[in-house]
Design a protein with these regions (language model features):
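Positively charged, low-complexity intrinsically disordered leader regions
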Residues: 7-45
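A short helix->loop->beta-strand "cap" motif at the edges of active sites that frequently abuts
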Residues: 185-190, 265-269
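Conserved N-terminal subdomain of the carbohydrate kinase-like
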Residues: 72, 76-164, 191
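Conserved post-catalytic alpha-helical subdomain immediately downstream of the catalytic base
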Residues: 300-354
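Short pre-catalytic strand/loop immediately N-terminal to key active-site residues, enriched for Gly-Thr
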Residues: 46-56, 297-311
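Conserved phosphate/ATP/ADP-binding segment of small-molecule kinases
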Residues: 201-293
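Histidine-anchored nucleotide/phosphate-binding helix
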Residues: 58-68, 177-183
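Alpha-helix C-terminal capping segments
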Residues: 62-72, 94, 323-326
Length: 354
């Protein structure tokens, strides 16, 4: 008899009861969900004797924020089939995120079979926040994604969001992200991408090479680095410039940068970035720039006190995606995105639960 194939469809990995029916545009994203451990009362990690446990991760935060705004939102990931993995899924489901395609793995599928973890030391006043990641050999980094039918996974969706964090985790994740981008393009999904560079996961050059490779498949670009676009690519971290881009640009500077992107990647339909002004560890201001429909727009400036800064960029992304899905006018799009980020800074936890 012929040997039985090890390839399985997404639905065979997980109980289909974990989905629910909604209407409207359908959104899907893919990434790692992590256990977050935070010392209470702004304590430093070296002082901590106990931790508050919650869950988060860039793509999961976006899925949850959109679900809370009423969008049909699905999250695809790999977690261990144990109490921690199931608790992460339960947290997503409790916030109306579809988890049907999520994969729960056994030790024979991912040898370490663990959930990624990170420790957050919340800043206060002049002391900034600090993060320590413990996500090496997590379940998603060791899973064989050739078992996943991406055509089936993306069937029926309108929008796919991906980031530069997931491909930084491991080679298998890089392959998955590129394959998802290509499949999404074939199926006609709108694709958003956030480079989201993490220096603890890979080098600047590795990130730049990979993220630049992704650009031809992207419709909506969030953030403007790290990409191969500039003549002096070695001078990316001096003064108030990064990757040849000013950290706090004028309107004219930002318009010129956007035009540079569009000249090289005319398939881009929208580019947006937010700009942060840090007055202290507990007070910031935000505004944003967006290129859309041939014009550059500048948002209002929002100033706010910070309860929890983690997930502010994800809230910006989810706000923009929501506004685009609902056909907001351009200025309303960018103002809603910045307002979403600002309000997230007043909410404890990773996600913008409003």
């Amino acid at each position: 008899m012929p040997e039985k194939s090890n390839r399985r469809t997404v639905m065979e990995h997980f109980n289909p009861i974990l989905g629910h029916e909604t209407t409207g545009p359908k959104f899907i994203t893919c990434g790692e969900i992590m256990l977050r451990l935070t010392p209470p009362n702004y304590e430093k990690l070296r002082m901590a004797t106990n931790f508050e446990a919650s869950y988060g991760g860039s793509e999961a935060n976006i899925a949850l924020a959109l679900a809370n705004l009423g969008v049909d939102s699905t999250f695809f990931s790999v977690v261990p089939n144990n109490s921690l993995g199931k608790s992460a899924v339960r947290w997503l489901r409790s916030n109306d995120v579809h988890c049907t395609p999520m994969i729960l793995t056994e030790p024979d599928e991912t040898p370490s079979n663990r959930l990624g973890t990170y420790y957050l030391e919340t800043g206060y006043g002049i002391r900034p926040s600090k993060v320590i990641y413990d996500r090496k050999h997590s379940a998603i980094t060791e899973y064989d994604f050739s078992q996943v039918d991406l055509n089936e996974l993306l069937e029926g969706f309108d929008w796919l969001h991906l980031s530069g964090i997931t491909p930084a985790l491991a080679p298998n994740c890089r392959g998955l992200i590129i394959d998802m981008l290509k499949e999404a393009k074939k199926k006609g999904l709108t694709v958003s991408f956030d480079g989201n560079f993490r220096s603890t996961l890979w080098t600047w050059d590795e990130a730049r090479d990979f993220c630049t490779e992704c650009l031809p498949y992207v419709d909506v670009l969030l953030g403007i680095e790290p990409y191969h676009l500039w003549k002096d690519e070695n001078d990316h971290s001096k003064g108030d410039w990064k990757d040849g881009v000013p950290l706090q640009p004028s309107y004219e500077q930002q318009d010129e940068i956007f035009q540079h992107f569009i000249e090289r990647y005319p398939s881009l339909k929208c580019i947006a970035r937010h700009v942060r002004y840090a007055h202290s560890g507990s007070e910031n201001s935000l505004k944003a720039f967006m290129w859309y429909d041939g014009h550059t727009f500048e948002s209002k400036l929002f100033t706010f006190n910070i309860l929890d800064r983690v997930g502010g960029g994800d809230a910006f992304a989810s706000g923009l995606i929501y506004a685009m899905l609902h056909n907001y006018k351009a200025m309303d799009m960018i103002n809603f995105a910045v307002a979403s980020s600002a309000i997230k800074h007043t909410i404890h936890g990773d996600a913008n639960i409003t």
